[in-house]
From Swiss-Prot:
It is a single-pass membrane protein. Keywords: ATP synthesis, CF(0), Hydrogen ion transport, Ion transport, Membrane, Mitochondrion, Transmembrane, Transmembrane helix, Transport. It is found in: Mitochondrion membrane. This is ATP synthase F(0) complex subunit 8. InterPro entries: ATP8_metazoa, ATPase_protein_8. The gene is mt-atp8.
Length: 55
């Protein structure tokens, strides 16, 4: 029974998982979230109040 011999399919299985575990974290870590906290420090908040002519 060839399915009981682990040599051919086990190495393919291990290599496939090694490739997936190497590629997927890179894809996840390269994803940029739009609402990071470090973006708040780049813009200086305005210090003047708004002018509302109707109030």
């Amino acid at each position: 029974m060839p399915q009981l011999l682990p040599t051919p399919w086990f190495t393919i299985f291990i290599y496939a998982w090694m490739v997936l575990l190497a590629v997927i974290p890179l894809k996840i870590l390269s994803y940029v979230y739009p609402n990071h906290n470090y973006l708040r420090g780049l813009q200086k908040p305005s210090e003047h109040s708004w002018f509302w002519p109707w109030s």
